[in-house]
Structures are given as C-alpha cells and as structure tokens.
C-alpha cells in the first residue's frame, strides 16, 4: 500500500503541476518548465513567450504590491488616516494616477526596451559577444533596479504631498512603499531570471559567466532571505520602535499593525522562497532525470546549461561525463568491431595477458573461389563492395550461432566456436553456421562461389604477440584442418566440407543434416580424413 503524501509533498506537486515545473511530470523539460517552451522553438516565438511571461508577472507583482501597501497604510497605521487627514486629491487623484502611469510605462519600458535590447542578439540569431552575455546575465538586476527606482520615486512623491498635511505621513508612506517596493523588486528579479533561462542558456554556451555576475547558490539564497524576510522583519521592528517613540497608536492598533505586517511578511516571504526553491530545484531535477536515462543506457543528447550558479557547473559536469561515456562507448564499439565482441568483453572483464589456454572448440574457414580473377577483372570499388556483402553474410551467421570472427585475411574469414566464450556443443554451432552461410551465399550472392571447411578438437586460444601489441588468436590441428578442408571444398560440388570427427561429436539433430563421404589425406596431414557433406 503506497505511503500517504505529506502536506509539503502535496503542495509541491500542486505547484509543479500549476506552473508546469519539472518534477513528477511525464517528461522533464529542457529548461525545467514547460512554460519556457522547447529548445527547438524559433527565436521570434521564444521572444513572444518571454515577453508575455515577464509582462504578466510584472503586472501581477506590482498590483499585488500596490494593494498590500494600501492595506498597510490603511490598517497598520490608521492614525493619521490618508482618507480623512490628508487632501482628497492626493489619495484619490495623484496616488492612483502615479500607480497607473508607473505600472504602464514601467512594464512597457522593461519588456520593450530593457529586455528586448539585452537579448536582441538572441532574437536576431547572432552568436553572443562578451558584452551580449554580460547584458543578458545582468538583465534580472536591471529589472529589479527599475522597480526600486519607480517605487522609490512614488514613495518620495507621496510622502512629500502627504507630509504637507501631516509630517507623520512622511515616515508611514516611505516605510510602507519602500518595504513593498523591495519585496516586489525581489520577486521580479527571481521570476525574470526564470523567464530568461532559454536566452541565458544560449549566453552560457559561449562560456562561463564572470564571477561578479554569478553570486552562486549561497549568495542568491542569502540575498532572497535578506530581502524577503530580513527587510520585512526589520520593518516590523521599526514599526514597534516608531510607535514607542511617537505614541500615536493604541495597543490594539499596534497589535493590528504588527499582525498585518507579519501576514504580509509571511505571504511575500513564502512567495520569494518558493521561487528561489523553484529556481534551485529545476537544474537538479533535470540532471536527476538525465542520470536516470543514462542508467538505462541512453547517452543521447546533452543537457541545456541554463543556470549561472554552481548548478550550471553541475549541468556542465554532467555533459562532460556523458561525452566521456559516449567516447568510451565509441572506443568499445570500435574495439569490438576490430577484435570481436567476445574478445572485447573478455578484455574488459580481466586484464589481457600474453599466453593461451587449451579449449575444445570448432573452427570454420571460409574463402572465395577465384578471388585473383575477381580482382583482376573488376574495378576495385566493385570488389570492395562485393567483399563487404560477402562478409556481412558470414559475420551475421557466425554471430547468430554464438561464434567469433577471429580474423579476416583478404577474401577469407576464420570463425571460432567455443573460444573465448565456452559453448556446450561447439560442433553443432559451427556446422549449423556453415550450412547457413552456404545457403545464404547460394541464394543471395550466386555470382560468388566460396569454399567452407569445418573442423573441431583441442586448440590453444589466447593472446599472441608482444606486450606492446598482441591479438587474440587460436592455434591447433583443427585450425589447419579447417583451412585444408576449405581449400578442398573449392573444387567440391557441395562447396562445404567437414571432418567426420566433427560430425560424430555433434548432436543427433545436427548429424541428420549431413552425410559421410570419401576419405582423403589433406595436404600437410599424415592421417587420412573422412569427409562429411551437407545433405
């Protein structure tokens, strides 16, 4: 029975689903969230997406900040009142007009001028220069700075106008507007950094960011804590100190003020910490999902490096690791192609050493008939193409019957069954593979005739050569016998010959496909050999 999810897990999952942040979603987005689109998205469409995200969040954050500032001024500091103790044209005229004008002009200026100018290189599909990368990484700071300036101007303007009616308003207005402005700027900084991930990824492709533009995880966390929690808590303490000095609030009004400021701190603090956790968790989850794919053997594709902190270095390190694994797999594949998969696997399992061991194995030798005339009468390119088709059939059948292509020698191939990997009945595998090769050559390449010889017995298999250069090979009577049988098979109607000893050692099922023939003395052998041919 699955364990019940905690409240934190449920809240996290709800936020992930609502924002399309990576986590338990079916597929991990390249930039950590589906809100940011795909890597293959066109620059123009990406710009529209970024503009919409930044515009919507700036509008939402500022409207929320304005409402909170109004609540703080109205309920946290009810005396003096902005409705009864101040000119109406300031409360209902100048304040709404400035808020509307600043919100409209600020949003337009940020999205159209500042953001577009900083990422113009990405929209125009140009490679980022050092200045372009610097401007892109500085963009969240500039967005936050514009917000602080506009909020400070508004606070100074309203404090001056309200202060003409009552000097107490100066402290109240400056305090309320400044606190809310800092919180709004912090939120906009973090969310702008999130929205710019696709462009930041392009900038980070050109190189690592300068240290002064990448404060790191600790710097980012401490900054968010200071602005999201430290400043509001300082504001609460300042409020209490102000009341103690001025004595303009009753005990109930002070409690209300502290309560409102505390709730505001909790809400905005939660919001900025959630965005911070969002920004921090996304690169980790992307790397985690990629590691899971690597565990399953998928080495395709690199991660998009979209974070300028140590998390970006983690993404770079993952890409370097995967590149190393891909290179290792490429070398392993090349090694396996050159020496055989089984030999390569054995070399990986244990340190290769010079020497050999006795093995009971079967050997198949395949050689093209009339290869000299073939080379003389055909263009070289045609000969190579024909040999590749020929060897493709041989390799395919040898692999299918669990054998090893030990070497290619011109137009001939030597296959081993039972070394380095042991087989219960190497004779069965070798005889079946030889029959399959002969059948396929007759059907698929009738223009090519090849002799095939099969022999089995005790061989010595191991690494032969020097310490600097050696290769896996087999030596023994069955190897020589298979080569002589192949030579004899070139002039035999069946084109395929095996020794009777090999046939006798095979299973009854495989023997049913063969029949015994004449007895001959092979070249270089003193003892006669009885031949076996396929039926």
From Swiss-Prot:
Subcellular location: Cell membrane
GO cellular component: extracellular region; plasma membrane
Annotated transmembrane regions: 63-83, 90-110, 143-163, 168-188, 226-246, 258-278
The entry's keywords: Cell membrane, Membrane, Transmembrane, Transmembrane helix
Ranges of residues in domain HAMP: 279-330
GO biological process: cAMP biosynthetic process; intracellular signal transduction
UniProt cross-references to PROSITE patterns, sorted A to Z: GUANYLATE_CYCLASE_2 (PS50125), HAMP (PS50885)
Cited Gene3D superfamilies: 6.10.340.10, Nucleotide cyclase (3.30.70.1230)
Membrane topology (UniProt): Multi-pass membrane protein
A molecular-function term among this protein's GO annotations: adenylate cyclase activity
Annotated ranges, domain Guanylate cyclase: 362-486
InterPro entries: A/G_cyclase, Adenylyl/Guanylyl_Cyclase_3/4, HAMP_dom, Nucleotide_cyclase
PANTHER family according to UniProt: ADENYLATE CYCLASE, TERMINAL-DIFFERENTIATION SPECIFIC-RELATED, BLL5647 PROTEIN
Family recorded in the similarity comment: Belongs to the adenylyl cyclase class-3 family.
Designated name of the protein: Uncharacterized protein Rv1319c
Species assigned in the record: Mycobacterium tuberculosis (strain ATCC 25618 / H37Rv)
